[in-house]
């Protein structure tokens, strides 16, 4: 390795189950494991929030569930990137990051297919009046007389 310091990446502790197995087995960092210039370490948040102290020696953070707010920003000024594993910035104080020059990114492609499948499912359920029909079935014999009103719809 050169004299240059390693690029250190903190991975949200939420990427691991309690037994240490990965939550997302397909999120494989194996190909980077032998790279001498990159170092990965799992960092667990405290009370659902990343702590500044645990991030002092990192250049980047791959964030899953924990919150990252103004109090999470390390004083070392080394942290340059937060890659939010998911969509939305609801768990990241973007303004605080902007003020400290920390770039924040998301991964929208990761949820496009599941969101599309959910939307299509809702369209089919609503157009077929699934909720009304579900209530009729759950209502038992007392609601059976109403079934005729919904025949041929959906």
Predicted regions mapped to residue ranges:
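N-terminal glycine-/charge-rich "phosphate-binding" loop or analogous flexible N-terminal tail
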Residues: 1-58
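Short, acidic/turn-prone active-site loops that include or flank metal/cofactor-
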Residues: 15-16, 85-89, 109-112
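Short beta->alpha connector loops
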Residues: 44-47, 64-68, 86-89
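Short acidic/histidine-rich motifs immediately flanking catalytic phosphotransfer sites
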Residues: 55-60, 77-79
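Rossmann-fold NAD(P) dinucleotide-binding segment
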Residues: 67-79
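Rossmann-fold NAD(P)-binding glycine/threonine-rich loop
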Residues: 90-100
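Phosphate-binding beta-alpha-beta segment of Rossmann-like dinucleotide-binding domains, i.e.
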Residues: 100, 108-154
């Amino acid at each position: 390795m050169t004299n240059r310091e390693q690029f250190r990446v903190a991975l949200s502790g939420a990427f691991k189950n309690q037994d240490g197995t990965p939550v997302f087995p397909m999120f494989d960092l194996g190909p980077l494991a032998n790279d001498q210039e990159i170092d990965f370490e799992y960092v667990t948040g405290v009370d659902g929030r990343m702590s500044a102290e645990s991030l002092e020696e990192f250049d980047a953070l791959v964030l899953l569930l924990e919150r990252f707010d103004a109090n999470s920003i390390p004083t070392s000024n080394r942290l340059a990137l937060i890659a939010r594993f998911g969509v939305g910035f609801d768990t990241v104080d973007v303004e605080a990051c902007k003020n400290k020059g920390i770039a924040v990114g998301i991964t929208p492609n990761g949820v496009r297919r599941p969101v599309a499948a959910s939307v299509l499912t809702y369209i089919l359920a609503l157009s077929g009046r699934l909720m009304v029909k579900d209530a009729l079935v759950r209502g038992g014999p007392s609601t059976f007389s109403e079934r005729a009103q919904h025949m041929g719809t959906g």
